[in-house]
Curated annotation (Swiss-Prot):
Name the UniProt record assigns to this protein: Multicopper oxidase LPR1 homolog 5
Induction: Induced by phosphate deficiency.
Subcellular location: Endoplasmic reticulum membrane
Keyword field: Copper, Endoplasmic reticulum, Glycoprotein, Membrane, Metal-binding, Oxidoreductase, Signal
Name of the coding gene: LPR5
Amino acid sequence: MSPRIQQLAAVLLAAVVVVAAARDEPAAAKNYQTQWDTVMSILNCKSDSLIPSYICSVISKSRWGWASDDPNDDEYTPPDHPLPAPAAGRRRWPVMTSLNLTKYVDSLPRIAKIRGYGIRHGRPVPIKLTIGMYSKTWQFHRDMPPTPVFVYGQSLQTATFPGPTIVARQGVPLAVEWQNHLPDAHILPWDPKVPTAIPKKGGVPTVVHLHGGAHPPEFDGHAFAWFTRDFAENGSTWTRKTYTYPNVQAPGNLWYHDHALGLTRVSLLAGLLAAYVIEKPELEDPMNLPCGDHDLHLVIADREFYTNGSISIDREWKPEYFGLVITVNGKAWPYLSVQRRRYRLRILNASNARYFNVTLSNGALPFTVIGSDSSYLSRPVTVSNLVLSPAEIFDVIVDFSRLPAAMTEIEMLNTAPYPFPNGPNVTDPNLDGKVMLFKVAGKGKVDDMPDKSKVPEHGVPYASVAALPPPTTTRYIVLYENQTAPGNLYINGLRLEDPVTETPKSGTTELWQVINLTGDNHPLHLHIATFQAIKMTKIEGFQVFKDCMIKNNNTATCNLDQHAVGPVVPVPEEEKTWKNAVKIPPEFMTSVVVAFRLVEANQPYPFDATTEPGFVYHCHILDHEDNAMIRPLKLLP
């Protein structure tokens, strides 16, 4: 018997022993985790593994799961209804990580685009699209089984993870009928203790929110405007099958995703997310930016997978979801072959809770930032790294022609701790900081076409903070955690269901002083409005102020003016524009100017933004949003 066969036999025997022991003693399964991890590390399911991939697949399906009471239950099946957390001593099945998936074996998918307008007599005209939500499987990695997902598409066959990018034209309305074709039960478990849309007749509630969109409230995707398959059942604020997006705002990058009450974190985790772009050729064409095949979306999202391919999430609500696999455009650690030329990369962090601090091979190439969220910058800004919160978008140019001739590979790396910013700065062996790889053509390779693009000298001159009408109101927005019931994360000590307290007048500007009493950085997102941070002030005597606020929930009583006197931290240059998500650091008061009007034209909305059901604002860490860092926002005439 050859040494390789002997080694293989020993590994297989070890796997059988560990699995059998764990199944015989579920309560003591944790004692076998180290042995199992060792076995799986050797098997590895990699192309260079000791054993062929098909044998590895068989072994990987033999691991213990939630220690099922059913001895015949050998496969994990996503629950058809919410289930309690596993009892003490029960184990999850081993998951896919950077240790058992080979990186850079799948090419980066090019996301399909849907044109959101028609052409008649050479001019763009409004059209109607029908886009559905479908249940299917998706291959996240060459060596993984297919994964059950929920995805957007114009048909089941064309639906993808992420969904198709809708390309709209500024000033041309787009009607979309959103259709729910999802099954009777969610593919992921959800926690019934969190306020959740629960239909009486079964089905998966969904509603689509255009993140960054300026539109009437009835088209906003309100959390209570959910509906189930074939519109069989709907929430209290549902009114229509078709949403109309006026696309009157400035050109830029948006995205659309599910927003049903209490299910946002699991439905986006399942795949209900996609990009949306508003174009304005007369403004953008003269900028001569990289276009066509050299203009790409990079939709980054972390996930955790069981080794049978299904997505893993705890059955009970947890403060943050962090996956051990980094996906870009629906592939785990993909690669992209590029020419030595400029590329435009529209980078969206679509993760539930993970922040990214990305570099290109630790600064080998810079990012030239031309836009953030749905707005261009007033001028390009060159940086060595980008910090992206969940839901944040950076529009950048990367010039691969600047690489040394001998350098033909460059990695996108992430160094952000998790939770951000105070998570441990210890390297997790299951997550090594890699995001994706760019394979750069050799110096002598002939480009497919000459690079005539450029980095523009100037961006877009939106109305500045000073040019807008002066703020009519100053509001104090306080972010709490565990103020009442354990686990709740509230804004101003209130829930979504509590009476509205933020009632700005449509067309006005306000100053929001956002105070973060938690240990996390929170990406603040306001529906309808665009906004920008102007400064961040350290809160001195933080614990004294926090204790007072938890007791009194009143900034005047707690002498905010005596505490918000610490060092002032400037806003990064690449974030100085009108945004849809602003980072709120812990122990700071962040001053945010909020424009309830169109900032490109510096005009009021050309539609009625005061109708029902109103809007919301919330933290865009999805686990926080669901429980319950979200509040109503009602514009007044």
